[in-house]
Swiss-Prot record:
One GO biological process term: translation
Similarity field: Belongs to the bacterial ribosomal protein bL17 family.
Name of the protein: Large ribosomal subunit protein bL17
InterPro entries: Ribosomal_bL17 (IPR000456), Ribosomal_bL17_CS (IPR047859), Ribosomal_bL17_sf (IPR036373)
Species name: Staphylococcus aureus (strain NCTC 8325 / PS 47)
UniProt subunit comment: Part of the 50S ribosomal subunit. Contacts protein L32.
Record-level GO cellular component terms: cytosolic large ribosomal subunit
Amino acid sequence: MGYRKLGRTSDQRKAMLRDLATSLIISERIETTEARAKEVRSVVEKLITLGKKGDLASRRNAAKTLRNVEILNEDETTQTALQKLFGEIAERYTERQGGYTRILKQGPRRGDGAESVIIELV
């Protein structure tokens, strides 16, 4: 399966995709360029599939990709992005067989004309 280089070295590209995937899991909606969104879509789809499995090996594989970021909930409790993935997001998509994300085009970005999109969880 091919991938986009995104104008970066492999370690920079992996770090950027980890950050984007973690941000998408936390906020469930991010704005980025079209190329980055298409690339992070495959990462997030695989993470959600791991979350649906729910076993220890899947949790460890997902922990390799996601950043260890704590989220403050409305009820003043904290959880990590990994806990959110295996808790509420995995429950939401138990009946769905893939296609967990949606990409909405916004048009060109003002500064450099790059195609701007919103990627969100369905």
